[in-house]
UniProtKB/Swiss-Prot annotation:
Annotated organism of origin: Synechococcus sp. (strain JA-3-3Ab)
Major location (coarse): cytoplasm
Signal sequence, start to end: none
A Pfam family matched in the record: RBFA
Protein purpose: One of several proteins that assist in the late maturation steps of the functional core of the 30S ribosomal subunit. Associates with free 30S ribosomal subunits (but not with 30S subunits that are part of 70S ribosomes or polysomes). Required for efficient processing of 16S rRNA. May interact with the 5'-terminal helix region of 16S rRNA.
Annotated protein name in UniProt: Ribosome-binding factor A
Family: Belongs to the RbfA family.
Subunit structure comment from the entry: Monomer. Binds 30S ribosomal subunits, but not 50S ribosomal subunits or 70S ribosomes.
Record-level Gene Ontology MF annotations: ribosomal small subunit binding
Length: 149
């Protein structure tokens, strides 16, 4: 078992090297169909498995095509990682699509939709007379006290 520090360091090195490989080494046109960026790399504690999370910009067809290209390039990527990092055992590489950015933007859109009707209700519900009465309250109380005396 590797220490947590070593696992994190290997994950960061894999992330850097795979980014370079995707940028300049892979010749498969399917990988270039959508803009690919590596979001995160998770390496198991025994350094045997590496899950590479990628974010792909493009429509659904381009994303699917890019994932197919990455799947076919996996043996090449694994071999390159082994040569560049010099690890005794090269981790098995799996590319996974990270959809957290899509989910985050969808949540933000839903929040904006909820906020717009709430703001409209606040604008309709605010009455200028209410603010005026609140300002008059201290004076009104004094008038009542002076009348009672």
């Amino acid at each position: 078992m590797a220490t947590a520090r070593r696992v994190a360091r290997v994950a960061e090195l894999i992330k850097r090297e795979v980014s370079q490989i995707l940028l300049s080494e892979i010749k498969d046109d399917r990988v270039g169909a959508g803009m690919v960026s590596i979001v995160d790399v998770e390496v198991s504690n025994d350094l045997q498995n590496a899950r590479i999370f990628v974010s792909i910009y493009g429509d659904e067809a381009a994303q699917q095509q890019t994932m197919e290209g990455l799947a076919s390039a996996t043996p090449f990527v694994r071999r390159e990682i082994g040569q560049r990092l010099g690890l005794r055992r090269v981790p098995t590489v799996v590319f996974l699509q990270d959809r957290s950015l899509e989910r985050g933007s969808r949540v933000l859109a839903l929040l904006n939709q909820l906020r717009q009707p709430a703001e409209a209700q606040q604008q309709e519900g605010s009455h200028p007379g209410v603010e005026g009465r609140m300002a008059d309250t201290p004076g009104g109380e004094e008038d009542e006290l002076s009348e009672q005396q």
